[in-house]
């Protein structure tokens, strides 16, 4: 897997392999970042939160494109080690923090400051998107006019629009994966 664009374009990311791991495909990442850029994202002003980060392909792509900072939340030890190796090999370790903790525990706390882009990519079948979203929205994790991205299994029904004052901006399906992008209403 390679970084698609920006300062680290073409650089290889290590990935975690085995049951339960599914790194974001290149076409999914390209589509997602195109959707964000089409909606006016200015990377130099972005703090990015990658929840259930895995190998960190989304957060490292954001950093490569110029995001100011990224936080990665990943409780799996093997994946967290992969995140650390990727941060070092890309020269991005000074622009990110890796939280090797349970996502529900981390998001139950208040952040030091809100994030402009939050990506939530829970393991399929684990029923973690809704409780994580609840913590994120109640805890002040999302900046005004911030974007929330969900990478979930196609069959999962989620509609947080009214409950959390979000507006669905885009939705795409790739095989068994559905990408949804919401913006926070102000």
Which ranges hold each PLM region?
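Class I S-adenosyl-L-methionine-dependent methyltransferase catalytic core
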Residues: 1-186
């Amino acid at each position: 897997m390679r970084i698609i664009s920006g300062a680290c374009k073409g650089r290889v990311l290590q990935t975690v392999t085995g049951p339960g791991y599914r790194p974001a495909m290149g076409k999914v990442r390209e589509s997602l970042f195109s959707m964000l850029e089409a909606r006016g994202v200015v990377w130099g002003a972005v703090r990015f939160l990658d929840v259930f980060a895995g190998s960190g392909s989304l957060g490292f792509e954001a950093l490569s494109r110029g995001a100011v900072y990224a936080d990665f939340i990943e409780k799996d030890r093997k994946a967290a080690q992969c995140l650390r190796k990727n941060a070092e090999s890309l020269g991005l370790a000074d622009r990110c923090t890796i939280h090797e903790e349970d996502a529900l525990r981390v998001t139950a706390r208040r952040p030091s400051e809100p994030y402009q882009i939050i990506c939530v990519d829970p393991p399929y079948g684990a029923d973690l998107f809704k409780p994580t979203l609840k913590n994120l929205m109640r805890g002040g994790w999302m900046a005004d006019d911030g974007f929330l991205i969900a990478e979930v299994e196609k069959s999962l029904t989620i509609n947080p629009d009214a409950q959390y004052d979000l507006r669905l901006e885009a939705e795409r399906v790739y095989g068994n994966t559905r990408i949804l992008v919401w913006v926070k209403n102000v």
